[in-house]
A protein has these predicted regions:
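Compact structured core domains
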Residues: 22-70
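Broad, structure-driven detector of short, well-ordered beta-strand segments within folded domains
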Residues: 15-22
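Nucleic acid-binding interface residues in structured DNA/RNA-binding domains
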Residues: 2-13, 65-174
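Beta-strand secondary-structure signal
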Residues: 4-6, 17, 27
Length: 174
């Protein structure tokens, strides 16, 4: 059974939706996000302990604090490539960013590959089912462009501002 809960965010952000299996968080996304269909129901509305834990984490995060814990989440349909990309995303510190190309270079080096596609990395980043917890919003295009965020460019900008970035240094999509 899949459970669902709606999380009202502070002003300046779209609200969020979360799903869980009864023990683990399995999805966290902005309401109306591109690709939200991958989280489609049917759901049972319930406020589970993992939703309470995730809500507490989000409350702290949206107040500009760095929570000292991570809610229990479980990612389904995880390929080895996606896992590698998501592990790199989890290692991007609060207040820092990386480009898709930098992530690709890390994978090249680790696997001893002659080349890794930044576009393939982008596909894996876009697949992330638990946004913010796995901080895909910290990934930029090669020229510092704010591209490829399924939660909406406005939310990406707001998240980066919340983390202390001067977003005027980034390039906005046209």
């Amino acid at each position: 059974m899949v459970y669902h809960w709606h999380y009202p965010t502070p002003e300046g952000f779209s609200d969020m939706e979360m799903t869980g299996d009864g023990e683990f968080l399995t999805g966290l996304w902005f309401t109306g996000a591109r690709g939200a269909g991958k989280h489609s129901g049917p759901w049972t509305e319930a406020f589970l302990p993992v939703f309470a834990e995730t809500s507490q984490w989000l409350d702290l995060y949206f107040r500009g604090q760095q929570p000292g814990f991570v809610p229990k989440f479980q990612i389904q349909n995880l390929t080895p490539f996606r896992q590698e990309v998501l592990e790199i995303l989890q290692a991007i510190p609060h207040g820092e960013t990386m480009t898709y190309g930098q992530i690709a270079r890390q994978i090249e080096k680790k696997q001893g590959l002659p080349q890794m596609s930044a576009q393939a990395v982008g596909g894996a980043v876009g697949w992330n089912p638990v946004c913010i917890l796995i901080p895909c919003h910290r990934v930029l295009g090669a020229n510092g462009s704010l591209t490829g965020y399924g939660g909406g460019i406005e939310n990406k900008i707001a998240l980066l501002k919340l983390e202390g970035h001067d977003v005027s240094k980034f390039k906005l999509p046209k």
